[in-house]
Amino acid sequence: MTPLFRKAVWLLFAVSVCAFAGSLAAQYVLGMEPCVLCISQRLCVLATALCAAIVLMCRPRRKAGGLFGAVFISIPAVTGISVAAYQLWLQSLPPGTAPSCGAPWTFRLKGWPLFDWFEPVVRGFGNCAEPDYLLGVALPVWSVAYFLAVALTVWWAWARAK
């Protein structure tokens, strides 16, 4: 792994941890109630941080290892982009016509062995069709920008490292 690629992955890890902490702060400090899709995006941010940490711990030495790292980090980023884009589409529909965004995560994971520990991360019963704003911009737009920045950064660093 080249120094540039390693620094980029460290940056992505740090930004992902901050974004995850920010999503928890928005819920528990600012009082924003996340919906199922918001929580899915939160889990994609967490997965991005975990993937970056795994790439940093594995320290791939060959170019193929760097390619693996870029693909590995891109998977949750692309998933997050698709979830946020779906939520933006839901929010663009006329009021009352948006379909349900699914069962709450707390219901889906109730029987999971680590549920009591993980429950604060997946708790939320907000409406996916009602937008929340940060600095005048809808939160799914911020999510798309974050995930797009992750994907572009990791592929830029990989291309520069070749």
Swiss-Prot record:
Residues 1-8, 61-67, 161-162 are cytoplasmic. InterPro entries: DiS_bond_form_DsbB/BdbC, Disulphide_bond_form_DsbB, DsbB, DsbB-like_sf. One of its GO terms (cellular component) is plasma membrane. Residues 26-43, 86-141 are periplasmic. The chain crosses the membrane at residues 9-25, 44-60, 68-85, 142-160. It is a multi-pass membrane protein. The keyword DNA repair does not apply. It is found in: Cell inner membrane. It holds the Pfam family DsbB. Keywords: Cell inner membrane, Cell membrane, Chaperone, Disulfide bond, Electron transport, Membrane, Oxidoreductase, Redox-active center, Transmembrane, Transmembrane helix, Transport. The keyword Cell inner membrane applies. Gene3D superfamilies: DsbB-like. It comes from the Bacteria. GO terms for molecular function: electron transfer activity; protein-disulfide reductase activity. GO terms for biological process: protein folding. Coiled coil: none annotated. Disulfide bonds join C35-C38, C101-C128. Required for disulfide bond formation in some periplasmic proteins. Acts by oxidizing the DsbA protein. Belongs to the DsbB family. This is Disulfide bond formation protein B. It comes from Neisseria meningitidis serogroup A / serotype 4A (strain DSM 15465 / Z2491). The lineage of its organism: Bacteria, Pseudomonadati, Pseudomonadota, Betaproteobacteria, Neisseriales. The gene is dsbB.
